[in-house]
UniProtKB/Swiss-Prot annotation:
Interacts with the Sec translocase complex via SecD. Specifically interacts with transmembrane segments of nascent integral membrane proteins during membrane integration. This is Membrane protein insertase YidC. It is a multi-pass membrane protein. Required for the insertion and/or proper folding and/or complex formation of integral membrane proteins into the membrane. Involved in integration of membrane proteins that insert both dependently and independently of the Sec translocase complex, as well as at least some lipoproteins. Aids folding of multispanning membrane proteins. GO terms for molecular function: membrane insertase activity. It comes from the Bacteria. It comes from Histophilus somni (strain 2336) (Haemophilus somnus). GO terms for biological process: protein insertion into membrane; protein transport. Belongs to the OXA1/ALB3/YidC family. Type 1 subfamily. GO terms for cellular component: plasma membrane. Keywords: Cell inner membrane, Cell membrane, Chaperone, Membrane, Protein transport, Transmembrane, Transmembrane helix, Transport. It is found in: Cell inner membrane.
Amino acid sequence: MDSKRSLLFMALLFISFLIYQQWQVDYNTPKPEVTEQAQVSEVNSTALTATSDIANDTQAKGRVITLENDVFRLKVNTLGGDVIGSELLNYDAELHSSAPFVLLQNNADKVYIAQSGLVGKNGIDSRAGRANYQVEGDVFKLAEGQQELKVPLIFEKDGVIYRKVFVLKPGSYALEVNFEITNQSPKPIELVPYAQLTHTLVESSGSMAMPTYTGGAYSSSETNYKKYSFEDMEKADLDIHTKAGWVALLQHYFVSAWIPNQDANNTLYTLTNTKKHLGSIGYRSAPIVIENGATETIHTQLWTGPKLQDQMADVANHLDLTVDYGWAWFIAKPLFKLLTLIQSLVQNWGLAIIGVTLVVKAVLYPLTKAQYTSMAKMRMLQPKLQEMRERFGEDRQRMSQEMMKLYKEEKVNPLGGCLPILLQMPIFIALYWTFMEAVELRHAPFFGWVQDLSAQDPYFILPILMGASMFLLQKMSPTPVADPMQQKVMTFMPLIFMVFFLFFPAGLVLYWLASNLITIAQQWLIYRGLEKKGLHTRVKK
């Protein structure tokens, strides 16, 4: 296999990967699993309170207050204490926009809110009505140097004082939402905490070049991470009993997640309202009995922000898996750490991509050298192989036996040119997902005209350069392709790939371009060594 065939093989593998990926998105939606049962202690029937009791009014009319730290600004409705809006202050809505990115919102075009409350026998957040909390003030902002901001919302009913306390910390997208309940009534009360994320039902968007997922996900004691799409929600309600865990709604680069008390028994659930075109994913905990004169505190957290892996891993187990690298995660994670390390040194994500490419190509150089050496040896055997074809003609069995004998005598592996490529493909796929999933590349500039590595090149310069580098790689091939049809395919391959990559993120095209240029340099170096060994002769074209 000469280098032209290697290039074709690599291209076909890559295209096959993209087609398979898109097919998975479009047609291979798995049947929802709704009966996962974790090992939890027995809970009484009240713990399984029907989710139909949970309030799902997204248009509750209450006073709206603002909570803010240095990374986000939240809108909270005092009727129920739901978070109905979030602005991410360090992320622009669009490139070069002065407006912050809006994640949670509640308007005529889109509903995406984080609800929480107390249901059960003595619940205050049923469909019959929500708790109307009182709070002094409208705007609460974490001051510079302040380590924590607590904002208590207070509601009293039948001798019970309910305090819903929001806790903000500097630099954190994790919001603590704690219930402090003091029972001053003469009887014990029973409550079931719940929290859910409600979103307008939508389909995952994107393209073959940049697929994106918008939908639910969850983690339980038996499943570290699993997606549960809006389509799944419409087919069957999720109903998983587990200890710990979390529920989330994902979109490209951003996530909102409710994390309950990790020591409690919880039921993860979904709800859909087809009339209002809404879907919810949430959890409800085991019932809590509060005796008269007692006070109980219920802890929960809401993450609403970018997919920052290190921070999310500190908030909850496996929450960082929402940065979904697919099956290549074990390669992608260290590659991402390498990418961030290089970026911290060079202070440019484009240069960091080139740096990662250099490191990867250096690590793979022994495989690359073995590939070209094997191909060179195969070329040296071509006259003998052609002679065998002519001698044995239709006797394919004899010809195969003689060929294998020749390979053994010459110590040549006929698959030596393919195997290194197959071994490199998982690394390329891991890099692909690393660049696709990293929110750090969103609106990250390289230089000049490339101001957003997560978007396509606005002037298509990088794809054109990438196509030219592929053409140059072809021209460096030591032998022409004999088959006319294959020759035509190879002639148009750089053009096909150039058109294909017009719609890819600039960061991924930059990686491919850098990889091609490094391959050209490595190929030149390897061929020089092979010439000295008499295994390669330059062909004038």
